[in-house]
Amino acid sequence: MGQTARMTRLTAMLAAAAAGAIALSGALPTNAAPPPEPVGSALPGDLAKAFQSASTSYDVPREVLVGIGYAESHLDGHNGEPSQANGYGLMHLASNPTNPTMSEASKLTGLPVEKLAKDSAANIQGAAAVLDSYADQVGLAGSARKDLGKWYSVVAQYSHSADGPTARLYTDEVYRIIGLGVGAAGVSIDPKQVTPDRGKYANVAPLGTRTPQSIAAVDYPGAIWNPAISSNYRVGRTAAISTIVIHVTQGSYAGTISWFKNASAKVSAHYVIRSSDGQVTQMVAEKDTAWHVGTANPYTIGLEHEGFVDQPSWFTDAMYRSSAAVTRNIADRRGIPKDRAHIKGHVELPNQTHTDPGPNWNWTYYMQLVNGDNPNPPTYNFTTYGAGVRVRATPRLNGTILLELPGPTQVFVTCQTQGDSVTAEGTTNNWWAKLRDQGGYMTNIYIDYPAAKLPGVPDC
């Protein structure tokens, strides 16, 4: 939804929360600085230390904490600004009628809400405290806490999802990330093969299970039907459909789906599209009016895209292509011209305070896809982490050093190739990215993405 910071809500939370007596020693940077030349295991950065400290203090596996943090935010606290569900920080501690994790974290840690919202280390501590409390409630203790698979029901509870299928969607994504491993924002976990103990969720049909009823309900044949609660949209239309609106969720895929099923949200969209693979969930029938753009609701269809406007790493080629297919299908069925006058960003509608999809959304590429072209994927935007990351003439550690990146930097990757292996913070990667503007190569290990190979980027 790409909204501006809603500090009035944070102020209300502060007024309602008891002031904490415990304080952590200062805010930690979102991106830790690794050594300039990684040839062995690097010392962990401050964010990595915060995860380890929280894990040790509350006996919650570090992999679980990092998996949740990456699923929620790609390990970015977004300067304490709220998500669409009023969640804060890289662990998405929330304050809404169905998700009390922020107030729980404040009570359990003694930390004030403002610190939990804005300080990444405090946010991680708060999440660990909540997870520890939930683990106690289900009797997860002793050596069983070392078994990552046993944490499944605890992670599902942490999601406070609207229903079982959405809770399973959320938790399966966390475990998928744990399986892939993470190397982002100075934090790394090695890939782990984990067999989740789904408990009561074992009998919950995963979101996307198709039935004759769900197939009949969707307007776009490739979509999964998972309806929003009826109090979050209006049945029917008062105007002809003429415009398709592109949104960014300012939150996770599972979290957005759950929020649209929450009666207190008073918002919805017709479609939600996942970053990792372009999965499409339809939540409101096109014949009905979703609540996503205020006065423009009656004549628009809304597409929400998982991610945050200030993090281009969420905008994968899989998501662009999947979304464009949905938009093209809608336009063709409804006779809507496939141009920018009729396919707009949220920010372009009247009387909006929202900024999505933001400057990182590639409109040129998207419209080419909508119009049925098959362009080469664009140069992909990613963010590096750390200071002193070297760009070399070749993907080799003995390649000529062209320059060093001074700190977290947005880079434009044209392709990727295998080269020398680089090890940092216990993770090894032999994939290198070719940078458009710097004219050389950097190791993928210092690009903010959890897998060794960057998504959608072609091989050199």
What are these regions (language model features)?
Residues 5, 170-226, 237, 309-381:
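Basic/polar, cationic surfaces and motifs that engage anionic cell-wall
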Residues 34-177:
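Catalytic glycan-binding domains that act on GlcNAc-containing polysaccharides
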